Amino acid sequence: EKTAFYHTDAYSGTADALAVDKIWYTTPIGNSEKWSATVGPKIENYYMYAAPVSIYRPGFHKAFKLGSLSGAYGASTKTGVGVKYVGDNGFAASSNVVSSSSTGAGFLTNEDEYKWDTMLAYTKDQYHVSLTLSQQHEDWNSFSYYATDAVVADEDSNATAYAARAYWRPQESGTATPEISVGYDVISFDGNSGSNKVKEATSYFVGLGWPDMFQDSDYIGIGFGQPLK
């Protein structure tokens, strides 16, 4: 069974346009079937993750993608590079970075706005658990659309986030037993001074899904969660 690892958006502008949304190149490292490397001028962190972290289908609500696009995850289309290991026993690991590389800032310098994610994961046919460390530099705020206004106003600070994810699904689809995806994020900000500034924020997500209930490829889902606050 394929796991959804993307989200489609509709363009509603009035002018004709042709643009490249994502582009990258992935190659094995040496002759290895377990190690790979990715580089691209337009890529997001999660395309380079070691494993899919959620089986809840986001539908119309992108905030529920990847078990909640909150502290550690979020839209991040920039220049990126990463490495990934996927073992035969279910263990997988990845480390990748995307950088805005704005003019004069350089790559991974103190002035550069970048996001570096490292994941450890264990996945079997029916379940998955993972932990991701996200190091965000120079006011990176890809979490902003799933957070309270107070969290978004993080005063040009660096941040460190952790994302725990897990899912489980029954052996057979189309039954009354739902598949379940859960997520919990915590993010802490460096340098936020003053009593009205957020030092730490958390979020959570729970999604239940019933695939193939009436016919193949249909889906019934219920998802709820708390934005970063």
Predicted feature residues:
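Outer membrane beta-barrel
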Residues: 1-102, 121-125, 205-229
